[in-house]
Amino acid sequence: MKTLSKLTTALLAAGALCGGVYAASNGLDARAETRPLFNDKRPIITPQSLPGGAYDPNGDFSNDPNPKIEHLFLPWEDVDLSTLSTADEYARKRGRSLLITVEPWSWARNWRVTPADLLSGILAGHYDSNMTAICSAAAKLNTPVTIRWAQEMDEKNGQFTWAYWKADDYVKAYKHAVTVCRKSLPTAKYMWSPMGKDGLEAYYPGDSFVDVVGLSVFGYQPFDLRKLGRDSTFVEATKPGYDRVKRFKKPIVIAELGYQGNEAYVHGWAEEANKPHSEFPNLQAVVYFNDREVYPWPDGLGRPDWRVATPPLLN
């Protein structure tokens, strides 16, 4: 579970550790020659690479100079916002901006309301104080902030309450949340972040409510073999969603990237993920999701482990 307390623990632990700085040429540390190359799954970074980032509760990227974005996840209920200042200082020291995903629910599943009740509550202003609290806290931070609200609304796998809404209702709720947040946090960028599915355009809230478009891209070899009968590539997995959102003429960021498979599969994805591709001229950055999947994948494929190292790297 993506808890802010887990993040804070990781940040404090990482700050207490010491070790080699990762080489900018390939993202691997000086000890890499003593272990198999892809025990460390981090995207390979070169001077030509797109900016990278990470959601990193295990601290594997703590001493890595390559990431430029620190990704946080917050529920808008039951969250200790005082720890945002810890994350801010951690990111500032490393020259990173903050991408804050705000999920409009509680992470305690038995406390969640129905999709209809959540929607009506948002539109009636019952959750304005939740959004205001987060955005007011973010306004006090020293690092640049991007707010990503209610992500992957076009993914109909039952994971997110807001994904049950009709598209026009999602648009109303998104506009309401951003309008509330802007009152406290006018300097932030606002990210609209679909999964990348067919029909996502119906959820687009309009240019004035979107500064950057996010996408989620995952490569899971068992799923590929089940559905395609072969391995997929990063470009192949990214292209459908990219092609659907490029019409909006906004900067595009892969807000969540993950991959799991055998060594050859991981090698291919790690090598390609942050490389500039002619197919994706508007792609501005790629942010890795460094944790286990929260929900099982279909067809009994379990929960993919996107973590770049197990056990976590001690940088």
Q: Where do the language-model regions lie?
A:
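Distinct, well-ordered alpha-helical segments
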Residues: 196-209, 266-267
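Glycoside hydrolase catalytic-domain groove-lining segments
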Residues: 86-103, 205-208, 215-262
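Acidic (Asp/Glu)-rich catalytic clusters
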Residues: 58-66, 82-100, 133-142, 204-208, ...
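Substrate-binding cleft of extracellular glycoside hydrolase catalytic domains
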Residues: 81, 85-189, 289, 306-311
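N-terminal substrate-binding region of glycoside hydrolase catalytic domains
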Residues: 33-129, 259-262, 287-288
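C-terminal region of N-terminal signal peptides and the immediate post-cleavage residues
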Residues: 19-36
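Aromatic-lined carbohydrate-recognition surfaces of secreted/lumenal glycan-active proteins
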Residues: 174, 178-200, 251-262, 288
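Substrate-binding cleft of secreted/luminal carbohydrate-active enzymes
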Residues: 36-39, 43, 146, 151, ...
